[in-house]
Amino acid sequence: MRNLAAKFGKIFDICKKFSKNLVDERGNMPRRGVVPRFSDLEVIALGLTAEQFGVDSESYLFALLEEYKSDFPNLISRRQYNDRRKFTANLCEQIRKNIAQAIDAGEDVFCVDSKPVPVCRIARAKRCRLGKYDFAKAPSFGYCAAQDCYYYGYKLHALCGLRGVIHSYDLSKASVHDIHYLQDIKYEYHRCTFLGDKGYLSASVQLDLFETSEIRLEVPYRLNQKDWKPTFAPFAKARKRVETLFSQMVDQFMLCRNYAKQQVGLFARIISKISALTILQYINFINNKPLGQIKHALLQFRQRVTYK
């Protein structure tokens, strides 16, 4: 795993740039007790670096870091990293939002879709301990129409702009219908257009969104539906952007592979994967490259590294 320390420095600088007023001068969130030498920003940057290298196993990550002891003199233990990664998940999400606003602040057309996030095979669902003591956050059985299969886990809902930047997302039980996500975000957006698939088809929800926040929900008609109209081709083409994002997250960030034993750990991993995707898009943005070409974005990043 070459250049891990160099890539870490680049990502750390980006996180530091977008964390103003969120952390102190040492890169830590305000809290009581001993000030950690390995700062909260460094924990976030290390997690994002691992995700961008395709390393989603903490055990494998710390085995790789054995070669970089001189570059990380204050590196914490694996157990401390696991705990602090969960602790800093909200800070990581706030930094991601700041980056997304810098890339795509004036967007008024968004694509909405959902993606299954299985936590184990169907046969092992009853033995899965994820969420065993918290039913509200526990996984459930669901059905994916696109893949024509049942699964046990969660459902990732995402709202992205036409350029492919994720502005909002949420994780729900697999059994929750896609359309309920729109009720959660209708107060966050105003006077814009949402492009969805047939899973978001509902006249009552369309009317409610428009009356509440002047949001137009554009979905394709079913063939046997009353007052059928053909799909507007530019909308159909634009909506595929969110599907491309999900494909990239499954391929490069291994969204559907789960090592977490608790819900908070799984949620922290999802936040890291989406934040890593957003940072790669930001690197392409400042290099005037297509935002969707994230595979080799870090190789083209020539910004001077200040981390040491």
What are these regions (language model features)?
Residues 1-308:
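Short alpha-helical elements
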